[in-house]
């Protein structure tokens, strides 16, 4: 049976993650309050931000920026986009 969570981003019950994505309290919070759908979308967006903004994960400032944007994204707030990115229309 699939575990469900009240997703912080989508404000509805959705399937949850299989395990915490990070160790510690941050990972536990994401595991308990973020759906698999929201986490998968964040991972795609994170990759786009790293590539388009040429973020260096060895740089503490770049990691802090990405962490802040993850918190915004998963909370349903306004978050940084890659410059010039236009989401595909249906």
Curated annotation (Swiss-Prot):
Q: Which GO terms describe its molecular function?
A: iron ion binding
InterPro entries per the UniProt record, alphabetical: Fe_traffick_prot_YggX, Fe_traffick_prot_YggX_sf
Q: Which Pfam families does this chain map to?
A: Iron_traffic
What is one GO biological process annotated to this record?
cellular response to oxidative stress
List, alphabetically, the GO terms of the cellular component aspect: cytosol
What are the annotated disulfide bridges?
Answer: none
* Entry keyword set: Iron
Family stated for the protein in its record = Belongs to the Fe(2+)-trafficking protein family.
PANTHER family tied to this protein = FE(2+)-TRAFFICKING PROTEIN-RELATED
What is the stated purpose of this protein? Could be a mediator in iron transactions between iron acquisition and iron-requiring processes, such as synthesis and/or repair of Fe-S clusters in biosynthetic enzymes.
Its protein name is: Probable Fe(2+)-trafficking protein
The organism of origin for this protein: Ectopseudomonas mendocina (strain ymp)
């Amino acid at each position: 049976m699939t575990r469900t969570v009240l997703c912080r981003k989508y404000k509805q019950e959705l399937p949850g993650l299989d395990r915490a994505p990070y160790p510690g309290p941050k990972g536990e919070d994401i595991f308990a309050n973020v759906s698999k759908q929201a986490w998968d979308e964040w991972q795609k967006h994170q990759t786009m931000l790293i590539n388009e903004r040429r973020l260096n994960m060895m740089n503490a400032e770049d990691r802090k920026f990405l962490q802040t944007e993850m918190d915004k994204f998963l909370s349903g707030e306004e978050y940084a986009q890659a410059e010039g990115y236009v989401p595909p229309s249906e």
